């Protein structure tokens, strides 16, 4: 089952500023995934074929038949060939040319594919000179001997000999054995797991190994190894289930290539096709399929035949039906694309976190809906191809084994462009407030010029178009724990959970010491209860961006600084924070690498029961406000959360919180890649 869609392009009309799909490009940009797993999509409606198209197809078939008959009449009988008779009367003596011995492939065919891709042979200048002299000696006419003499003079010139030496150097390099293939691209993760296993070892060697693996030089080495290995493993060798070959030949007066791919039943072909007039053209090669693994099918190739079945003149639905019944060896007759094919590039896999929800069934612009990859905000995507800047090919984290083909997701620039146009349309539909729309636009432009301020974080976030954030795996060191930031609406239990952790395990958890401008009281100690500072010093630190969050209470300033959090981390403890949404940007832009957990409220009735245990009797509208506030926080800041806990029961939530914190010691976590640079 498949669905056909056009590769839509967003255009802005001159009048309404809206979006439109270019109707004229429907036939040209339609794509269908052929030989896809049946659960990936639904069937498309057939394309209506006009009588004129049938007439053109018939005319082309008649012309091809006439050309074949003409070539047959022009063929000469080899037995009556005057040239062959003359050669048989005066046969030429064959000459052994040692310079060409290494150029012959296994099949001995000079026109075969293997001879074209074989590495250059190493030649000796003396052998070349000897072969030329033998050729000159065997020639009878003086003109040919003079021609060979000119070649001999050329070979003996210093410039030619330098070029000849360069040729041999390149040939020597290309004939070298390939470097060893990497076994894994997760050496850094393995080293971190080993470090955790041996850090409490009772053996001297185990402690020494733990110390060695925790050094910055070793971690940098493992990171460099994984970066190189990840690139090397991108171009993996052909798997045994995909055998392929390619030959060039003439077909109907055109130069075509014949591609044979042996495809297993569990490996989809992984290609999309589109109609271009009466032609069927390969539109996209999808990662993970037999077409991509063979490396012989390319975008822009026109399909003429598949296993002897003529394809030209058929629509994409018919092509789907033809391929649905074919297994084993698939033989394609193709007209190669006229586009110049650049050599394959070892693409680096880019890991991103999705900051928006995406459902391809609701996207009219996805070029091939059955290949669209559905994902939710917070999912990790592995981008394996960005050849098409508008539509990337990706896998969801954890689905690589269950997802045979890569899926299509919107490219970052494309997603930003169409979201910006949606916002423009919505703004244009809003009623004018003062008679001129320019007023609102000027206000918006002024916000962008405003310096980032935690107190105005909501305005700052409204200007962003959330798409993707590049991520990398990070395993926290044993002596430098990530701070835990709890966030949620009031009365959702985040403060109670924090206090329980602090009182239950004081040797493991600690809170940052806040700053204040009020006077110190008798029982208080500077640096233990508060950092007591002057109002001027507090304002200077606030202007310098040193506070995660700050506020004023009874004409005194209070604030939590990044330095206070860092002091807790330096002691080896886990710093616990309860912060507001306005503080998340400052916290994440620091070097603290926080782990942010959202504490969400349960249903309204369950929330009422939880608050009743604390002798609280909120009104129904207050409960609705808490739930609505949580929904707004998740909608506006959910892309910044690392985990979420629905607090249906405080004891269960406490155990879940402990599980998430303990997991940071044993498993690497996805963090923004900018944190590791």
UniProtKB/Swiss-Prot annotation:
All residue ranges annotated as the SH3 domain in the record: 347-419
Membrane topology qualifier: Peripheral membrane protein
Region of interest (Required for the correct localization of PALS1 and PATJ at cell-cell contacts and the normal formation of tight junctions and adherens junctions), ranges: 1-347
UniProt-listed InterPro entries: GK/Ca_channel_bsu, Guanylate_kin-like_dom, Guanylate_kinase_CS, L27_C, L27_dom, L27_dom_sf, L27_N, MAGUK
Pfam families cross-referenced by the UniProt entry: Guanylate_kin (PF00625), L27 (PF02828), L27_N (PF09060), PDZ (PF00595), SH3_2 (PF07653)
Domain Guanylate kinase-like: from-to ranges: 481-662
Record's keyword annotation contains Lipid metabolism: no
Domain L27: from-to ranges: 121-178, 180-236
Tissues/organs with expression: Expressed in the retina and in the neural tube.
Protein location: Apical cell membrane; Cell junction, Tight junction
Listed Basic and acidic residues bias regions: 51-76
SUPFAM superfamilies in UniProt: L27 domain, P-loop containing nucleoside triphosphate hydrolases, PDZ domain-like, SH3-domain
Gene Ontology cellular-component annotations: adherens junction; apical junction complex; apical plasma membrane; bicellular tight junction; nucleus; photoreceptor inner segment; plasma membrane
Keyword annotations of the record: ATP-binding, Cell junction, Cell membrane, Membrane, Nucleotide-binding, Repeat, SH3 domain, Tight junction
Residues annotated for ATP binding in this entry: 488-495
Claim: Mitochondrion is one of the keywords in the record: no
Family of this protein: Belongs to the MAGUK family.
Function according to Swiss-Prot or TrEMBL: Plays a role in tight junction biogenesis and in the establishment of cell polarity in epithelial cells. Also involved in adherens junction biogenesis. Required for polarized epithelial organization, cell-cell adhesion and remodeling of myocardial cells during heart tube elongation during embryogenesis. Functions in cellular patterning of the retina and development of the retinal pigmented epithelium. Also required for embryo body axis specification.
Domain notes per entry: The PDZ domain is required for apical location.
Name of the molecule in the record: Protein PALS1
Species in which this protein is naturally found: Danio rerio (Zebrafish)
Taxon lineage: Eukaryota, Metazoa, Chordata, Craniata, Vertebrata
Gene: pals1a
């Amino acid at each position: 089952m498949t669905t056909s869609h056009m590769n839509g392009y967003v255009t802005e009309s001159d009048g309404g500023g809206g979006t439109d799909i270019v109707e004229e490009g429907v036939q040209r940009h339609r794509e269908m995934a052929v030989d896809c797993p049946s659960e990936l999509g639904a069937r498309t409606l057939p394309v209506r074929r006009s009588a004129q198209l049938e007439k053109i197809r018939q005319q082309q078939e008649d012309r091809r038949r006439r050309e074949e008959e003409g070539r047959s009449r022009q063929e000469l009988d080899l037995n009556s060939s005057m040239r062959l008779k003359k050669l048989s009367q005066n046969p030429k003596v064959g000459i052994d040319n040692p310079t060409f011995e290494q150029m012959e492939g296994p099949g001995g065919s000079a026109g075969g594919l293997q001879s074209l891709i074989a590495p250059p042979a190493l030649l000796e200048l003396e052998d070349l000179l000897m072969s030329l002299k033998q050729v000159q000696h065997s020639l009878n006419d003086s003109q040919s001997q003079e021609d060979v003499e000119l070649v001999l003079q050329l070979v003996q010139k210093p410039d030619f000999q330098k070029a000849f030496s360069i040729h041999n150097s390149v040939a020597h390099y290309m004939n070298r054995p390939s470097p060893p293939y990497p076994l894994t691209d997760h050496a850094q993760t393995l080293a971190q797991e080993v470090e955790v296993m041996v850090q409490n070892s009772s053996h001297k060697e185990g402690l020494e190994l733990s110390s060695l693996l925790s050094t910055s030089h070793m971690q940098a080495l493992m990171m460099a190894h994984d970066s190189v290995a990840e690139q090397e493993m991108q171009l993996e060798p052909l798997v045994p289930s995909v055998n392929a070959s390619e030959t060039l030949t003439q077909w109907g007066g055109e130069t075509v290539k014949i591609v044979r791919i042996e495809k297993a039943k569990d490996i989809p072909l992984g290609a999309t096709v589109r109609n271009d007039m009466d032609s069927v053209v390969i539109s996209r090669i999808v990662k993970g399929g037999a077409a991509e693994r063979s490396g012989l099918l390319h975008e822009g190739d026109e399909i003429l035949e598949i296993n002897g079945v003529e394809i030209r003149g058929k629509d994409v639905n018919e092509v789907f039906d033809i391929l649905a019944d074919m297994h084993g060896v698939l033989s394609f007759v193709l007209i190669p694309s006229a586009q110049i094919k650049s050599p394959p590039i070892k693409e680096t896999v880019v890991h991103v976190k999705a900051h928006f929800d995406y459902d391809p069934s609701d996207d009219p612009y996805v070029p091939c809906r059955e290949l669209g990859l559905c994902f939710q905000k917070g999912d990790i995507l592995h981008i394996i191809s960005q050849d098409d800047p508008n539509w990337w090919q990706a896998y969801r984290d954890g689905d690589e084994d269950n997802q045979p083909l890569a899926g299509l997701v919107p490219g970052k620039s494309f997603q930003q462009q169409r979201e910006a146009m949606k916002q423009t349309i919505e703004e244009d539909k809003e009623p004018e407030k003062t008679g001129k729309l320019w007023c609102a636009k000027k206000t918006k432009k002024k916000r962008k010029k405003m310096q980032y301020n935690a107190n105005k974080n909501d305005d700052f976030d409204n200007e962003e178009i959330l798409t993707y954030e590049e991520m990398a795996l990070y395993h926290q060191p044993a002596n430098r724990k990530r701070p835990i930031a709890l966030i949620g609406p009031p009365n959702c239990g985040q403060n109670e959970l924090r206090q329980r952790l602090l009182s239950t395990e004081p040797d493991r958890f600690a809170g940052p010491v806040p700053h204040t401008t009020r006077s110190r009281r008798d029982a208080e100690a500077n640096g233990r209860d508060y950092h007591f500072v002057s109002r001027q010093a507090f304002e200077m630190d606030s202007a310098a961006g040193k506070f995660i969050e700050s506020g004023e209470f009874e004409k005194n300033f209070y604030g939590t600084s990044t330095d206070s959090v860092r002091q807790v981390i330096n002691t080896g403890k886990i710093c616990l924070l309860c912060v507001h949404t306005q503080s998340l940007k400052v916290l994440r832009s620091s070097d603290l690498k926080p782990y942010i957990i959202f504490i969400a409220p349960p249903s309204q009735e369950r929330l009422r029961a939880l608050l009743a245990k604390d002798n609280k009797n909120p009104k129904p509208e207050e409960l609705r406000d808490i739930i609505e506030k949580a929904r707004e926080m998740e909608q506006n800041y959910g892309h910044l959360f690392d985990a979420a806990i629905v607090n249906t029961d405080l004891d269960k939530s406490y155990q879940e919180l402990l599980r998430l914190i303990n997991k940071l010691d044993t498993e690497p976590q996805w963090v923004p890649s900018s944190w590791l640079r």
